[in-house]
Amino acid sequence: MLRLAYAPVWIAASVLLVVTVLYLSLAPLNIPAELPTHFDKVEHAAAYVFLVIWFTGLVARPRYWRVVAALVVFGLTIEILQAAMPFGRQGDPWDVLANITGIGVGLAIASVATGGWALKVEAWLNRS
C-alpha cells in the first residue's frame, strides 16, 4: 500500500467495497424484464473497471499485478460460489470473461490516468 495518511479509512472503504460487490453478486437476483439480454455483462465489466481503479489508487505501480491477480481470483471465486448456490444464481464463464475485460480496461485507465489517485486526494485534503 502507498504511504497514505488516511490508510485506515482507505482500508475500511476497500473492505466495504469488496463486501458490497460480494453481496450483490450472491444475493437473490431480481432482474427487471426491460433490461436488454446480457446487460449483466456490462455490469460485470463496469464493476471490475471500478475495482481496479479503486485498488490501483492505493498501491504503487509495481504492485498493480497483485491487484489484477486478486481481482481475477475474486471474480472466479464468485462464479464458483454462484454455480454452487441452490437459488437463483448460476456461474457463467461469460461473466468471468466480462470481469477480465473490465480488469483489463481498468488497468489501462489506471496506467495512464488514475493510478495513485489516493495520494492526490490526500494532498487535496491536506491543503484545506
Identify the residue ranges that each predicted region occupies.
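Bulky hydrophobic segments
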Residues: 1-94, 100, 104-128
